[in-house]
Amino acid sequence: MNTLMQLFIFIGTMTLVFSCVPDVKKDSVVLMSDSQRGETLVAECMLCHSNKEAQRGPILHGMEMWYLMDQLEKFRSGVRGKLASNRSEYLMGVGARKIKDDFELAYVANWFSEQDPLPAIRTVQGSLEEGKKYFNQRCASCHGGNGEGNRLLNAPSLQRLEGWYFLEQMRKFRSGERGYHSQDIGGQAMAAASQEISDRNLRNVVAYCVDAFGPEEELSNRDRLAPNKSVKPF
């Protein structure tokens, strides 16, 4: 089956899925607003998912609620995070299974989606010109010209992704460490789309996305402490 046919099937499937998804956002907030359980869950997430933590997970602040719920459910159910070789996702799977039910899952997703986006250090370098060209040719049709995403296509926004995490996930899609499960429809589509992308093009695309519409740049400790970089070659 060619990629175009897979995409048409994927679009039809996701349209049906989202038409049946209940609106749990309001109920989840009401049910958990008077307890400390929600705050405890968020605090545990923040041990890894902020820009100040010791265990470095991706920043989730400001991401779309629907996408966070989708990925959390995949981790909780084992659609993601079952490969021990993929250590970061394996650990995330362990953490996600602490979420007891759909209301707790929705509370966590809602909390992160309502936070202001955090700045991020830019670590991926590449050709912005080549990256823009490749993005418009291969990525914009699903993720939007400004990386805003498209829920009907199950294509998340790219505007909150840190460069290092963005590049890491694209490599995992390409290698089969992500998008391997038969129930991960969106992941399988991305895995198929990334098979022929070279590492150079991956870096160019990520560098362009982060520069054009990614998180606000945060200076590294080195740049803050030594803003005037040495011109010496050593």
Show the residue positions of the predicted features.
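Extended amphipathic alpha-helical interaction segments
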Residues: 120-151, 155-160
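Electrostatic cytochrome c docking/interface patches
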Residues: 21-41, 53-56, 110-135, 214, ...
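Short microdomains enriched in Cys/His and/or Lys/Arg
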Residues: 65-76, 160-172, 234
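Bacterial N-terminal signal peptides that target proteins for export
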Residues: 1-8
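The canonical Cys-X-X-Cys-His
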Residues: 38, 42-52, 108, 131, ...
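Axial heme c-ligation environment in periplasmic c-type cytochrome domains
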Residues: 54-61, 76-106, 115, 120-126, ...
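The feature marks the first
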Residues: 34-77
